[in-house]
Protein backbone atom coordinates (compact mmCIF):
# COMPACT_ATOMS: atom_id res chain seq x y z
CA UNK A 1 0.00 0.00 0.00
CA UNK A 2 2.84 2.43 0.81
CA UNK A 3 4.37 2.13 -2.67
CA UNK A 4 1.23 1.73 -4.81
CA UNK A 5 -1.77 3.09 -2.91
CA UNK A 6 -3.61 -0.23 -3.29
CA UNK A 7 -4.97 -2.38 -0.44
CA UNK A 8 -4.98 -6.08 -1.30
CA UNK A 9 -8.20 -8.03 -0.78
CA UNK A 10 -7.20 -11.34 -2.45
CA UNK A 11 -3.74 -12.83 -2.88
CA UNK A 12 -1.70 -16.03 -3.12
CA UNK A 13 1.70 -16.91 -1.65
CA UNK A 14 3.47 -18.29 -4.72
CA UNK A 15 7.05 -18.98 -3.72
CA UNK A 16 10.36 -18.15 -2.08
CA UNK A 17 13.19 -16.67 -4.13
CA UNK A 18 16.78 -16.51 -2.88
CA UNK A 19 19.16 -14.07 -4.55
CA UNK A 20 22.91 -14.52 -4.15
CA UNK A 21 25.49 -12.25 -5.79
CA UNK A 22 29.19 -13.14 -5.86
CA UNK A 23 32.15 -10.99 -6.82
CA UNK A 24 33.32 -11.53 -10.40
CA UNK A 25 36.86 -12.61 -9.56
CA UNK A 26 36.19 -14.60 -6.40
CA UNK A 27 33.49 -16.65 -4.69
CA UNK A 28 32.96 -13.96 -2.08
CA UNK A 29 29.25 -13.42 -1.45
CA UNK A 30 28.56 -9.71 -1.77
CA UNK A 31 24.81 -9.81 -1.37
CA UNK A 32 22.08 -12.24 -0.29
CA UNK A 33 18.35 -11.66 -0.08
CA UNK A 34 15.25 -13.78 0.46
CA UNK A 35 12.04 -12.71 -1.24
CA UNK A 36 8.51 -13.93 -0.49
CA UNK A 37 6.65 -13.88 -3.80
CA UNK A 38 2.92 -13.12 -3.92
CA UNK A 39 0.39 -12.46 -6.66
CA UNK A 40 -2.85 -10.57 -6.08
CA UNK A 41 -6.12 -10.59 -8.02
CA UNK A 42 -8.15 -8.35 -5.74
CA UNK A 43 -7.46 -4.84 -4.47
CA UNK A 44 -9.05 -1.50 -3.66
CA UNK A 45 -7.79 2.06 -3.74
CA UNK A 46 -6.24 4.44 -6.24
CA UNK A 47 -2.63 4.50 -7.48
CA UNK A 48 -0.32 6.93 -5.77
CA UNK A 49 3.03 8.46 -6.66
CA UNK A 50 5.89 6.05 -5.97
CA UNK A 51 9.31 7.28 -4.85
CA UNK A 52 10.82 3.89 -5.84
CA UNK A 53 10.12 4.44 -9.55
CA UNK A 54 7.27 4.82 -12.04
CA UNK A 55 4.18 2.59 -11.80
CA UNK A 56 2.70 1.17 -15.01
CA UNK A 57 0.23 -1.60 -15.85
CA UNK A 58 1.70 -4.23 -18.20
CA UNK A 59 -0.07 -7.17 -19.85
CA UNK A 60 1.04 -10.52 -18.42
CA UNK A 61 2.10 -11.79 -21.83
CA UNK A 62 4.33 -8.72 -22.33
CA UNK A 63 6.25 -8.94 -19.04
CA UNK A 64 9.00 -11.24 -20.35
CA UNK A 65 9.73 -8.79 -23.17
CA UNK A 66 10.69 -6.03 -20.73
CA UNK A 67 14.27 -5.22 -19.76
CA UNK A 68 14.49 -7.60 -16.78
CA UNK A 69 17.25 -9.50 -15.02
CA UNK A 70 17.47 -13.00 -16.47
CA UNK A 71 16.67 -14.54 -13.08
CA UNK A 72 13.54 -12.40 -12.78
CA UNK A 73 12.37 -13.78 -16.12
CA UNK A 74 12.51 -17.28 -14.64
CA UNK A 75 10.09 -16.58 -11.80
CA UNK A 76 7.82 -14.53 -14.07
CA UNK A 77 7.70 -17.53 -16.42
CA UNK A 78 6.83 -19.83 -13.51
CA UNK A 79 4.05 -17.48 -12.41
CA UNK A 80 2.65 -17.23 -15.95
CA UNK A 81 2.61 -21.04 -16.20
CA UNK A 82 0.83 -21.27 -12.83
CA UNK A 83 3.63 -23.29 -11.26
CA UNK A 84 2.68 -24.63 -7.79
CA UNK A 85 4.41 -23.11 -4.76
CA UNK A 86 8.13 -23.12 -5.51
CA UNK A 87 11.55 -22.41 -4.08
CA UNK A 88 13.93 -20.74 -6.52
CA UNK A 89 17.58 -19.92 -5.88
CA UNK A 90 19.31 -17.50 -8.24
CA UNK A 91 23.07 -17.03 -8.09
CA UNK A 92 24.78 -14.24 -9.97
CA UNK A 93 28.45 -13.58 -10.58
CA UNK A 94 28.56 -9.84 -11.02
CA UNK A 95 25.56 -9.08 -13.24
CA UNK A 96 25.58 -12.48 -14.99
CA UNK A 97 23.26 -15.33 -14.02
CA UNK A 98 25.47 -18.26 -13.01
CA UNK A 99 23.05 -20.75 -11.45
CA UNK A 100 19.31 -21.32 -11.07
CA UNK A 101 17.94 -24.04 -8.78
CA UNK A 102 14.21 -24.81 -8.74
CA UNK A 103 12.93 -26.89 -5.81
CA UNK A 104 16.44 -28.27 -5.26
CA UNK A 105 17.01 -29.20 -8.91
CA UNK A 106 19.44 -27.44 -11.23
CA UNK A 107 17.78 -25.64 -14.13
CA UNK A 108 19.41 -25.68 -17.56
CA UNK A 109 21.22 -22.48 -18.51
CA UNK A 110 22.22 -21.60 -22.07
CA UNK A 111 24.43 -18.90 -23.53
CA UNK A 112 22.48 -16.62 -25.82
CA UNK A 113 24.13 -16.54 -29.25
CA UNK A 114 24.07 -14.35 -32.33
CA UNK A 115 23.15 -15.69 -35.75
CA UNK A 116 26.76 -16.63 -36.47
CA UNK A 117 26.89 -18.86 -33.39
CA UNK A 118 29.01 -16.56 -31.24
CA UNK A 119 28.00 -16.11 -27.57
CA UNK A 120 26.65 -12.68 -26.62
CA UNK A 121 27.66 -12.93 -22.96
CA UNK A 122 24.05 -13.27 -21.72
CA UNK A 123 23.01 -16.42 -19.85
CA UNK A 124 19.39 -17.51 -20.27
CA UNK A 125 17.33 -20.30 -18.68
CA UNK A 126 16.04 -23.01 -21.04
CA UNK A 127 12.34 -22.34 -20.51
CA UNK A 128 12.81 -18.60 -20.98
CA UNK A 129 14.86 -19.21 -24.14
CA UNK A 130 12.08 -21.30 -25.66
CA UNK A 131 9.26 -18.99 -24.56
CA UNK A 132 10.97 -15.89 -26.00
CA UNK A 133 12.70 -17.46 -29.00
CA UNK A 134 16.18 -16.53 -27.75
CA UNK A 135 18.98 -17.82 -29.96
CA UNK A 136 21.09 -20.58 -28.38
CA UNK A 137 23.51 -23.29 -29.45
CA UNK A 138 23.08 -27.00 -30.09
CA UNK A 139 25.32 -29.76 -31.41
CA UNK A 140 24.18 -32.29 -34.04
CA UNK A 141 26.17 -35.48 -34.55
CA UNK A 142 25.38 -37.76 -37.49
CA UNK A 143 26.75 -41.29 -37.25
CA UNK A 144 27.31 -43.14 -40.52
CA UNK A 145 28.92 -46.43 -41.52
CA UNK A 146 29.72 -48.22 -44.75
CA UNK A 147 27.19 -50.71 -46.13
CA UNK A 148 28.00 -53.12 -48.96
CA UNK A 149 24.45 -52.97 -50.42
CA UNK A 150 23.57 -49.29 -50.23
CA UNK A 151 27.01 -47.80 -49.71
CA UNK A 152 26.18 -46.05 -46.45
CA UNK A 153 23.89 -46.32 -43.42
CA UNK A 154 22.91 -43.50 -41.06
CA UNK A 155 21.96 -44.12 -37.43
CA UNK A 156 18.68 -42.44 -36.43
CA UNK A 157 17.25 -41.90 -32.95
CA UNK A 158 13.54 -42.01 -32.08
CA UNK A 159 12.73 -39.20 -29.67
CA UNK A 160 11.06 -40.06 -26.36
CA UNK A 161 7.37 -39.30 -25.94
CA UNK A 162 8.11 -36.81 -23.11
CA UNK A 163 10.37 -34.54 -25.19
CA UNK A 164 9.16 -30.92 -25.39
CA UNK A 165 9.63 -30.79 -29.16
CA UNK A 166 8.76 -33.38 -31.82
CA UNK A 167 8.07 -36.26 -29.39
CA UNK A 168 8.07 -39.74 -30.94
CA UNK A 169 9.73 -38.59 -34.17
CA UNK A 170 12.91 -39.90 -35.75
CA UNK A 171 15.83 -37.54 -35.41
CA UNK A 172 19.57 -37.04 -35.69
CA UNK A 173 21.86 -39.78 -34.34
CA UNK A 174 22.71 -37.61 -31.34
CA UNK A 175 21.93 -33.99 -30.55
CA UNK A 176 21.61 -31.69 -27.59
CA UNK A 177 21.76 -28.17 -26.27
CA UNK A 178 25.00 -26.51 -25.27
CA UNK A 179 25.16 -25.71 -21.58
CA UNK A 180 26.43 -22.29 -20.55
CA UNK A 181 30.22 -22.32 -20.89
CA UNK A 182 30.33 -25.15 -23.47
CA UNK A 183 32.04 -24.90 -26.82
CA UNK A 184 30.29 -26.60 -29.72
CA UNK A 185 32.85 -29.41 -29.75
CA UNK A 186 32.59 -29.97 -26.00
CA UNK A 187 28.81 -30.19 -26.30
CA UNK A 188 29.03 -32.66 -29.19
CA UNK A 189 31.44 -34.96 -27.35
CA UNK A 190 29.29 -34.89 -24.22
CA UNK A 191 26.04 -35.62 -26.09
CA UNK A 192 27.38 -38.57 -28.08
CA UNK A 193 28.77 -40.01 -24.85
CA UNK A 194 25.66 -39.46 -22.70
CA UNK A 195 23.09 -40.52 -25.31
CA UNK A 196 24.90 -43.36 -27.07
CA UNK A 197 27.80 -44.36 -24.82
CA UNK A 198 30.32 -43.49 -27.54
CA UNK A 199 33.46 -41.97 -26.04
CA UNK A 200 34.77 -40.24 -29.14
CA UNK A 201 37.91 -38.15 -29.45
CA UNK A 202 37.74 -34.63 -30.83
CA UNK A 203 39.61 -35.58 -34.00
CA UNK A 204 37.01 -38.27 -34.77
CA UNK A 205 34.29 -35.67 -35.35
CA UNK A 206 34.28 -33.99 -38.75
CA UNK A 207 32.99 -30.42 -38.58
CA UNK A 208 30.39 -29.87 -41.34
CA UNK A 209 29.54 -26.27 -40.43
CA UNK A 210 26.75 -24.30 -38.76
CA UNK A 211 23.00 -24.52 -39.33
CA UNK A 212 20.53 -21.87 -38.13
CA UNK A 213 16.90 -22.88 -37.53
CA UNK A 214 13.86 -20.94 -36.32
CA UNK A 215 10.57 -22.68 -35.57
CA UNK A 216 7.35 -21.92 -33.71
CA UNK A 217 4.77 -24.23 -32.21
CA UNK A 218 2.79 -25.25 -29.15
CA UNK A 219 3.96 -28.05 -26.87
CA UNK A 220 1.99 -29.22 -23.83
CA UNK A 221 -0.31 -26.23 -24.27
CA UNK A 222 2.52 -23.69 -24.10
CA UNK A 223 3.95 -21.52 -26.90
CA UNK A 224 7.33 -22.84 -28.04
CA UNK A 225 9.67 -20.57 -30.03
CA UNK A 226 12.93 -22.27 -30.95
CA UNK A 227 15.90 -20.39 -32.42
CA UNK A 228 19.01 -22.54 -32.67
CA UNK A 229 22.43 -22.26 -34.23
CA UNK A 230 23.70 -25.83 -34.52
CA UNK A 231 27.19 -27.10 -35.18
CA UNK A 232 26.89 -30.22 -37.36
CA UNK A 233 29.40 -33.07 -37.04
CA UNK A 234 29.91 -36.41 -38.76
CA UNK A 235 31.25 -39.37 -36.77
Role assignments for model-derived ranges:
Residues 37-39, 47-79, 98-106, 232:
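NUDIX/MutT-family hydrolases
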Residues 106-149:
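Acidic, metal-coordinating catalytic segment for phosphate/diphosphate chemistry
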Amino acid sequence: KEETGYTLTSWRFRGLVTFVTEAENSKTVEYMEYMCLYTADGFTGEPTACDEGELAWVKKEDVLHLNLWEGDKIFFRLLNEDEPFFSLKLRYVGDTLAEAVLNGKQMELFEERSGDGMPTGTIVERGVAHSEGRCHGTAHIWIARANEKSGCEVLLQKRSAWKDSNPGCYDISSAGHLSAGDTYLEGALREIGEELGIHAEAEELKDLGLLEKVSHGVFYGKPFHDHEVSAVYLY
